[in-house]
Amino acid sequence: MKTAENIAFGKRVAELRRNAGYSQEQFAFKCDVDRTYIGTIERGEKSPTLNTIEKIALALEMSKKELFDY
């Protein structure tokens, strides 16, 4: 479900992923999730689980706090 929070978080993930030089496919592999799941997060269509948030932060080599710093 698209919410303002999901959309903002998705934009943040997409921006950080691109800045790190990853395609969605590369990033999904690094996060150990499906590429389509990354796409739904970036479009604000899904709320990632805490486990996925942890994987995203680790893949981007940042803390969860930094991930939400937007």
What are the residue ranges of the model-derived segments?
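Short basic helix-loop element that most often maps to the first helix and adjoining turn
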Residues: 11-27, 60
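Short amphipathic recognition helices of helix-turn-helix/homeodomain-type DNA-binding modules
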Residues: 68-70
